[in-house]
């Protein structure tokens, strides 16, 4: 069983993280480990009709963001890596500065030190120079910066289509193949 850590921070776009967990429920060889910041819990209730319990039930394992002794806080606990979807600027800053005041940033720090993939789906706009510098620093220490920017070549017809394309592309970063892609991949013109 392969393990993937799914972090959800307080940035707008909680539905992306929810959809990722929904999709991974059907991938039998992936065990999901969910950690949500306190702000994510608030954003979830503001932006979606999902309850915290419903989202937690989508994950195989749920960790309290305050539990610094959780399995995912150690490099000896093997994972494929971690995605934070969405990733707030606060969380990005904590990761860049190794300020591991909770499990979300601690798990990300561990993934980086173990040289495993860390995908940060930074959700903020517009960006000022400080934000851009943080993203540059994160990339320099090994993170993949992957803002949830929609593509239009597959001609999305709904918000779900936009979300699905981002989720599928995130899974590509971990070489997780779905039985059927969630969007039409570019085949050339």
From Swiss-Prot:
Keywords: Flavoprotein, FMN, Prenyltransferase, Transferase. Induction: During aerobic growth, expression depends on the carbon source, with the highest expression on succinate, a median expression on glycerol, and the lowest on glucose. During anaerobic growth, glucose does not inhibit expression. FMN binds at residues 10-12, 37, 88-91, 123. InterPro entries: Flavin_trans-like, Flavoprotein, UbiX-like. It catalyses: dimethylallyl phosphate + FMNH2 = prenylated FMNH2 + phosphate. The keyword Thylakoid does not apply. Dimethylallyl phosphate binds at residues 153, 169. One of its GO terms (biological process) is ubiquinone biosynthetic process. GO terms for molecular function: carboxy-lyase activity; flavin prenyltransferase activity. The keyword Nucleotide-binding does not apply. Its EC number is 2.5.1.129. Disruption phenotype: Cells lacking this gene produce very low levels of coenzyme Q(8) during logarithmic growth, grow slowly on succinate as the sole carbon source, accumulate 4-hydroxy-3-octaprenyl-benzoate, and have reduced UbiG O-methyltransferase activity. In contrast, they synthesize near normal levels of Q(8) in the stationary phase. It comes from the Bacteria. Belongs to the UbiX/PAD1 family. PANTHER family: FLAVIN PRENYLTRANSFERASE, FLAVIN PRENYLTRANSFERASE PAD1, MITOCHONDRIAL. This is Flavin prenyltransferase UbiX. It comes from Escherichia coli (strain K12).
